[in-house]
Amino acid sequence: MRRAVCFPALCLLLNLHAAGCFSGNNDHFLAINQKKSGKPVFIYKHSQDIEKSLDIAPQKIYRHSYHSSSEAQVSKRHQIVNSAFPRPAYDPSLNLLAMDGQDLEVENLPIPAANVIVVTLQMDVNKLNITLLRIFRQGVAAALGLLPQQVHINRLIGKKNSIELFVSPINRKTGISDALPSEEVLRSLNINVLHQSLSQFGITEVSPEKNVLQGQHEADKIWSKEGFYAVVIFLSIFVIIVTCLMILYRLKERFQLSLRQDKEKNQEIHLSPITLQPALSEAKTVHSMVQPEQAPKVLNVVVDPQGRGAPEIKATTATSVCPSPFKMKPIGLQERRGSNVSLTLDMSSLGNIEPFVSIPTPREKVAMEYLQSASRILTRSQLRDVVASSHLLQSEFMEIPMNFVDPKEIDIPRHGTKNRYKTILPNPLSRVCLRPKNVTDSLSTYINANYIRGYSGKEKAFIATQGPMINTVDDFWQMVWQEDSPVIVMITKLKEKNEKCVLYWPEKRGIYGKVEVLVISVNECDNYTIRNLVLKQGSHTQHVKHYWYTSWPDHKTPDSAQPLLQLMLDVEEDRLASQGRGPVVVHCSAGIGRTGCFIATSIGCQQLKEEGVVDALSIVCQLRMDRGGMVQTSEQYEFVHHALCLYESRLSAETVQ
């Protein structure tokens, strides 16, 4: 009876021990159970609930005391990869609630950003131990429907309080290249299962995001192949632009330097050194850099050796020398400063003397004699014949001296500021002088204009001047008022590639200095525009007719002389209607080319009408004596003959009628 009672009690005790229900140390039971099941045993009750909720296969999992049929089926289909995390050795003395070893679960691999998933928690990630990380891993695997071995915890991000993880295929070795794309993983994520399984972690966000290591790796890829090419291309373009700018700058400097050298070469006057000797020394010759011919006399400058006496100038005939080819006269310092010409002088042996002596050169004498005496009178038939021989007219034109003015011959300081072209200057003997604003201001009397003689040498029949500049418009209208000019003829556009003339008249009314200009009427003709103007100064008025001829083409002569001839006839009619008034003002840009053509044609037509013959050569020479360079080119010289021939045919037609 007693044995019968003890046997059931003994069996009960054995079953309880096998079930692990003793209150003592049950670590041996945990190890045996884990070995049989192949799964970690959850310490907490909610962890056991998580284990029950993990469904690897859609069928229900039936458990046995020693094996699991579902696990056997799964193992046949997919070979379970052992966890790569090292497990701590079994130590009975360790408390299961405090297993500290989170570094064993964190892989810290440089995973590409496209494969990383970041899970943000409410729980402090710094307090997660290996047990909680395993729970987290299994919960994520359950939400994804994957095995825990496929979920890898890569990093714990303390600043964001989040866990960085990635998922790998089960049949491949875990590695960076095997990680599944984060977007594909998130599409298969069951949010409800995730929150139910890991409610104690307080998951707030699941998103793909770059990790710090990957960000560093991508930052290191700034100098990638594409980036390197982009930088090289940018630097190449920059170098090319800088090089082009430097080349353009150098070309500009060279161009400006060549212009300065040309100007200096044109303006430079080389004067021979003057030999200074004591009073008793013998005379020495003076050599000029240009020697056209020999002269019978030479000048000696004799100076007191002490430099106290006045210089004595004597003429000797002992030696033949070549005088300077330039006409010189005594000039002072103020005059030299007013000129833009550089002088090269040998002043090494000079004392307190004035070394300049005015001597007309043979070349100047010959040029002036030619201008005064040249003549070729043409009858009407000869005029028609010579027009057909352009080469004869060109040869004749080339023999006419230009008679340009040397800047030193103008005794007005700073006169260059009122010249449109530095080499086109008014002849001093025929220059128009304005009434000065005050006695000491000599510049206010200057304007680049000359009186031009007309038919039969009539004085002041015309005024040839340059196109007004912005700073000479007042001077122009002062000249028109002062000379009481009835007609102004303008033969240029305002701009032909470069500025030729400024708009010096108003649209309706304008005041220029002391002269008020009113536009009364405007008449548009085929080739020119006529404006009737009224000039007022105080209580006095003057009527002026302004002709603006715009049909002259750039850099050549017109194809037909008819428009210019008609303009000349209209101006001549107005001039005759205003007898007793001043000269006709004619200007183009420089005041010598087209201006010379108009005046030469006007004089030649009067000569044809009065005498029946014409001397165009003499007319042009007379114009150049009054203003150098008039009728500037051989083409213009031919054009004058064409205009005269056309006028002659008109006269013949009128005679027949």
From Swiss-Prot:
Protein keywords = Cell membrane, Cytoplasm, Glycoprotein, Hydrolase, Membrane, Phosphoprotein, Protein phosphatase, Proteoglycan, Receptor, Secreted, Signal, Transmembrane, Transmembrane helix
| One GO term (biological process) | ERBB2 signaling pathway
The record's principal subcellular location, in a coarse class, is secreted
PANTHER family with a match to the protein in the record:
PROTEIN-TYROSINE-PHOSPHATASE, RECEPTOR-TYPE TYROSINE-PROTEIN PHOSPHATASE R
**This protein's GO CC annotations:** cell junction; cytosol; extracellular space; perinuclear region of cytoplasm; plasma membrane
Origin species = Homo sapiens
Which Gene3D superfamilies does this chain map to?
Protein tyrosine phosphatase superfamily (3.90.190.10)
What Enzyme Commission number(s) appear in the record? 3.1.3.48
Q: Enumerate the Extracellular topological stretches.
A: 22-227
Name it.
Receptor-type tyrosine-protein phosphatase R
Which residues belong to the signal peptide in this entry?
1-21
Q: Which gene encodes it?
A: PTPRR
